[in-house]
Amino acid sequence: MPGVETIKSSWADEVELDYGGLPPTTETVENGQKYVTEYKYNKDDKKTKVVRTYKISKQVVPKTVAKRRTWTKFGDSKNDKPGPNSQTTMVSEEIIMQFLNSKEDEKANDPLLDPTKNIAKCRICNGEHWSVNCPYKGTAMDTNMMEKKASAAAAAAVDAPKSGKYVPPFLKDSQKGALGMRGRDDTAAIRISNLSESMTEADLEELVKKIGPQSKMYLARDKNTGLCKGFAYVHFKQRKDAAAAIEILNGHGYDHLILSVEWSKPQNN
């Protein structure tokens, strides 16, 4: 009677039985990189081997972030090691959030606070700075600019359309010799305000001499201290020169102050 033949299984089947179907996941670290090897079944129910490579880098994080990484995991990740698990966690790009209150948001949308826009404009060189800080102040460029403005203002005064209203003779430009009741002509007089205390008659003459000839200048001074009281009167020989002076000097920066120039108001007797 023949003996029963022993049926031997292959070594691959024995290995598969020993590992319970799939080998365990392994991790190795070499040359600053971590290699994670895992096994799984694909759609065709075939065993596949997946190797993931991670680059190990060190970074400085806030204490709260480092403490949060030590929290005890739960659920499907209860037995996972520190760090994300590819089976349960999907790592996306880092998003940095910045919280703004309503006031900061309004300031951010305010076009007047746009640093790319400069509200300052020089009256001398048309640069993006105040006229007081102009590097060309007092140079030939400043002189030419004042002469051009004076010519333009004089031409505008001459070419101004005449209205049908009655104009007294002493107010007409053609009646330059006609004087008022006080014995002087104030039609070509201007008042310059916001002058500094250190202003002198020589400074006042230097300020207006390039615009046109003057017949009289008066700088108001304090009787006790002798310092300038902040205003002065200049009488030009021609009314068009006075108009040009108002056009040029009104709003002009002088001695760290912004001048205010207007027509001199006649005094009541």
From Swiss-Prot:
One GO term of the biological process aspect: translational initiation
GO CC annotation, single: eukaryotic 48S preinitiation complex
Residues with PTM Phosphoserine: S198
Subcellular location: Cytoplasm
Domain called RRM: residue spans: 188-266
KW Protein biosynthesis (keyword) present: yes
GO MF, one example: mRNA binding
Keywords assigned by UniProt, alphabetized: Cytoplasm, Initiation factor, Phosphoprotein, Protein biosynthesis, RNA-binding
Domain of life of the native organism: Eukaryota
Pfam entry (one): RRM_1
Stored Gene3D superfamilies: 3.30.70.330
Quaternary structure and interacting proteins, as annotated: Component of the eukaryotic translation initiation factor 3 (eIF-3) complex. The eIF-3 complex interacts with pix.
Protein task: RNA-binding component of the eukaryotic translation initiation factor 3 (eIF-3) complex, which is involved in protein synthesis of a specialized repertoire of mRNAs and, together with other initiation factors, stimulates binding of mRNA and methionyl-tRNAi to the 40S ribosome. The eIF-3 complex specifically targets and initiates translation of a subset of mRNAs involved in cell proliferation. This subunit can bind 18S rRNA.
Stated family: Belongs to the eIF-3 subunit G family.
Name of the featured protein: Eukaryotic translation initiation factor 3 subunit G-1
Upper classification of the organism: Eukaryota, Metazoa, Ecdysozoa, Arthropoda, Hexapoda
Gene encoding the protein: eIF3g1
